[in-house]
């Protein structure tokens, strides 16, 4: 039996704000969207353009005005930067670097909802 990665889901409070953040911070773009007929949820699937793996952003109407409990934020996705120094400079200008370990050559960025993403060389 074999499995392959498909997607990771994150619930967000403002779908467009999150789409804009991921486009600017990580170069991800929307490849598919879906909205429930009753308007109770909206989905946006983002891609890096090089793999079939997707980041699914979910907006829930009944949860749009309250923060999600992210626990201790130890679960995260990691991205490899083709140009680490340029990526670091870009994220520093955006003001989204939330943790850095220069000895290990990595840092984390935080999205508008507080999710952390690791950036490595």
Model regions and ranges:
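Vicinal oxygen chelate
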Residues: 1, 31-34, 45, 88-121
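Core segments of cupin and vicinal oxygen chelate
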Residues: 2, 9-52, 107-108
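Eukaryotic phosphotyrosine signaling hubs
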Residues: 5-7, 72-76
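Helix N-cap motif at beta-to-alpha junctions
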Residues: 14-15, 81-84
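Short amphipathic alpha-helices within nucleic acid-binding modules
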Residues: 21, 85-90
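Short, charged/polar surface micro-motifs in flexible loops or helix N-caps
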Residues: 49-53, 62-64, 84-85
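Short hydrophobic-acidic sequence motifs that mark active-site Asp/Glu residues
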Residues: 54-56, 116
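Acetyl-CoA-dependent GNAT
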Residues: 58-63, 121
């Amino acid at each position: 039996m074999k499995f392959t990665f498909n997607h990771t889901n994150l619930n967000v409070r403002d779908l467009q704000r999150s789409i804009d953040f991921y486009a600017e911070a990580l170069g991800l773009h929307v490849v598919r969207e879906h909205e429930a007929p009753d308007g109770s949820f909206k989905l946006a699937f983002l891609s890096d353009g090089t793999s079939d793996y997707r980041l699914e952003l979910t907006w829930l109407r009944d949860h749009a005005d309250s923060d999600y409990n992210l626990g201790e934020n130890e679960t995260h996705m990691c991205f490899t930067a083709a140009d680490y120094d340029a990526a670091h400079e870009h994220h520093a200008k955006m003001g989204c670097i939330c943790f850095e370990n220069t000895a290990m050559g990595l840092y984390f960025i935080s999205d508008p909802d507080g999710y952390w993403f690791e950036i490595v060389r």
